[in-house]
C-alpha cells in the first residue's frame, strides 16, 4: 500500500480536475465509488456580528494565511454598522501564523513594537507597527486557557499597550516559535527555533498571560450569537 503522503499527493491535483475515489471500509465487502471535483477549501476563521446598536463582536478561531484580510473586512463591516465598542474573542484559539497575527495587530496598535523573537544565539528579530490604523474605541479581548501562541501575541500586545481589556482566564503559555522540518521518509520533526516576547519584554512561555478581569466566561456565547462568517 501507499503511505499517507503518497495518497494525499494523488488526491491534490489541479483545481477543477476530477478525482475518482474508491473507498474500502473495514468489515464491508462492497466499495464506495465517488467522483470528486477538486476545488479550494475555505475554512472560516473569522466571524462577526453587531451585538446591539453599539457593540461589535469578532470571533477569531485561528491565525491562518487568510485570517488577516478577513479580520480587516470584519472591522470595516462593523464600522459601517455603527460600531462604537468592540469585543474580540480569542477563546480556544490555539494560534497559527505569526505574520498573520502581526498584520492583524497593525489594525489595532499605535506605532511601536508588536513582538520580538530571540533564538538560542540571542539574535533578535523585531516586528513593528506604523500606527496608521490605531484602534481608539473601547476594546475587550476574551481569552482562556486554550488561547495560545499567536493568540497570546495578540492579547499580550493589546495588554502591554493598554488599548484594551483582557477578560477571561489565564492563557495557555506557549511562547516559542516552532518550525516543521520534513524528512526523506515522509515524516516530519517539529523544532523549536526561538522564543517570543511581548512588547514590554515579557516571556510568557509556560506562564501564560493574566487577564485584566478574571472571569469564567460562558463558552456558549458563540452559540447564542448568530454570526456572519467571512467567506
What are these regions (language model features)?
Residues 183-194:
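Short acidic, Pro/Gly- and aromatic-enriched capping/linker segments at domain boundaries
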Residues 149, 199-204:
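Metal-dependent DNA phosphodiester-chemistry modules and their immediately adjacent helices/loops
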Residues 42, 64, 114, 197, ...:
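Active-site/binding-pocket entry motifs
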Residues 36-42, 195-196, 211-212:
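A short, sequence-level motif marking secondary-structure junctions
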Residues 203-231:
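Conserved functional hotspot residues or short segments at active or partner-binding sites
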